[in-house]
């Protein structure tokens, strides 16, 4: 079968979209806080979040290709997976069809691959010819400005000599195929897998559920180097098959999407504290004194509270930095880079950074103000431990409405969030 032209797929990109966030005067419990800054007019702003692929620090060539497609708004799966995937981390992800999971491994592979003549650097396996064909063309679409990167697809139904000739005369850097054909080429030494650095299974449960196909995948896997990135994706991923997937991986980042297409994160220690509004500042001070952390993000509900709390923390000898919509885009970017580079350990922020801020060293999130929904809560606390490391989330509960949201979180995500104990084991939230 001859390779055809590219077909559409749901991959998204945007030019930093405008949002609005609440502007409110005063910190209700800020007895020790400085006076509020001048009123800030509620307005649109350009957000520092990964609502566009540019915030993932992708190659300009990839961003240009995405922009050419005219896609916007990365899906939640892309928000959560891509920052980990482009760093070479093992990933296991369950996401419904149409949620853009293909883009995760296509973009992350293209971002990382260093093409060397005659060497296959990335291998993608899937269970059908049609899917292999589609994936190959997604690679071609997004590598259109990376002419040095060669992609090829191999599957049954095509005379194997054609594939052998291609491998001999114009060896691709990225190979997509079905296990049977890939294994045949590898066994006959036409396809060398000794330089593969990215090993990807799409619709992995379909391949690993079938014993025959699983044997093929295992044999192929053993032909690749031990030191490589492994990513697995599927539209359905039962609890029974997940342990099988993990046998191929080392401490993978796990992301699962439920029936309502919302994101569920795992492995985060979560607690709440019941207190009055006036007690928040003192309790926050105590927590920052008592907890061990690399970096911490403190979420508040408005621009004025972010500015106030940041000033208060600095006055209390906690070197903090804040990001909110009352700043220019340039100032927000500068502050974000300062925090990302570790110049500051404490970030006070609004929901402006509730999505897509991916900083490996952040291991604690504190909800100084309760978010307004379970989904917002999820995205906030997901800032901690985002690269497979341990994390801790602490939420202040000071009103009946706060309790309502906390209950919604527990019901929605089937998680039991307990009150913060007097003593908490550092090993539960600090990377070893």
Swiss-Prot record:
Residues 82-255 form the Helicase ATP-binding domain. GO terms for cellular component: nucleus. Residues 283-428 form the Helicase C-terminal domain. One of its GO terms (biological process) is anther development. The keyword Hydrolase applies. It is an enzyme of class 3 (hydrolase). One of its GO terms (molecular function) is RNA helicase activity. Residues 1-28 form a coiled coil. Belongs to the DEAD box helicase family. DECD subfamily. Homodimer and heterodimer with AIP2. Interacts with API5. The gene is AIP1. Its main location: nucleus. SUPFAM superfamilies: P-loop containing nucleoside triphosphate hydrolases. The Q motif is unique to and characteristic of the DEAD box family of RNA helicases and controls ATP binding and hydrolysis. It comes from Oryza sativa subsp. japonica. This is DEAD-box ATP-dependent RNA helicase 56. Its EC number is 3.6.4.13. ATP-binding RNA helicase involved in pre-mRNA splicing. Required for the export of mRNA out of the nucleus. Required for tapetal programmed cell death (PCD) and degeneration during anther development. Forms dimer with AIP2 and binds the promoter region of the cysteine protease CP1. Can complement the yeast RNA helicase SUB2. Plants silencing AIP1 and AIP2 are male sterile.
């Amino acid at each position: 079968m001859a390779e055809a032209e590219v077909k559409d797929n749901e991959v998204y990109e945007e030019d930093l979209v405008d949002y609005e966030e609440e502007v409110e005067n005063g910190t209700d419990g800020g007895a020790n806080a400085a006076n509020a800054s001048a009123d800030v007019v509620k307005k649109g702003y350009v957000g520092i979040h990964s609502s566009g692929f540019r915030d993932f620090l992708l190659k300009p060539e990839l961003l240009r290709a995405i922009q050419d497609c005219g896609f916007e708004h990365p899906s939640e799966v892309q928000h959560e997976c891509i920052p980990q995937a482009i760093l070479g981390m093992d990933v296991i992800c369950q996401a419904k069809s149409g949620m853009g999971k293909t883009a995760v491994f296509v973009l992350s592979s293209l971002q990382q691959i260093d093409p060397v003549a005659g060497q296959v650097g990335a291998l993608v396996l899937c269970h059908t010819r049609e899917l292999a064909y589609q994936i190959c063309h997604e690679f071609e679409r997004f590598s259109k400005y990376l002419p040095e990167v060669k992609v090829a697809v191999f599957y049954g139904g095509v005379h194997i000599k054609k594939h052998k000739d291609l491998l001999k005369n114009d060896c691709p850097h990225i190979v997509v195929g079905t296990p049977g054909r890939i294994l045949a080429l590898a066994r006959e030494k036409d396809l060398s897998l000794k330089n593969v650095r990215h090993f990807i299974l799409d619709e992995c449960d379909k391949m690993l559920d079938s014993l025959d196909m699983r044997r093929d995948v295992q044999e192929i896997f053993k032909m690749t180097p031990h030191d490589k990135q492994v990513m697995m994706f599927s539209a359905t991923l039962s609890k029974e098959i997940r342990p099988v997937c993990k046998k191929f991986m080392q401490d993978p980042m796990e992301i699962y999407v439920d029936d309502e297409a919302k994101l569920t994160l795992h492995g985060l220690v979560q607690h709440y504290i019941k207190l009055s509004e006036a007690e928040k500042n003192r309790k926050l001070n105590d927590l920052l004194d008592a907890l061990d952390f690399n970096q911490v993000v403190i979420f508040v509900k408005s621009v004025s509270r972010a500015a106030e709390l940041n000033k208060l923390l600095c006055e209390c000898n906690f070197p903090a930095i804040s990001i909110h919509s009352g700043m220019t885009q340039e100032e927000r970017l500068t502050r974000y880079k300062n925090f990302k580079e570790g110049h500051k350990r404490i970030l006070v922020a609004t929901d402006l950074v509730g999505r897509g801020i991916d900083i490996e060293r952040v291991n604690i999130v504190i909800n100084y103000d309760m978010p307004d929904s379970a989904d917002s809560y999820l995205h906030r606390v997901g800032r901690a431990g985002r690269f497979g490391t341990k994390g801790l989330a602490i939420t202040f509960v000071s009103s009946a409405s706060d309790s309502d949201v906390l209950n919604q979180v527990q019901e929605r995500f089937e998680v039991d969030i307990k009150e913060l104990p007097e003593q908490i084991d550092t090993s539960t939230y600090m990377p070893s």
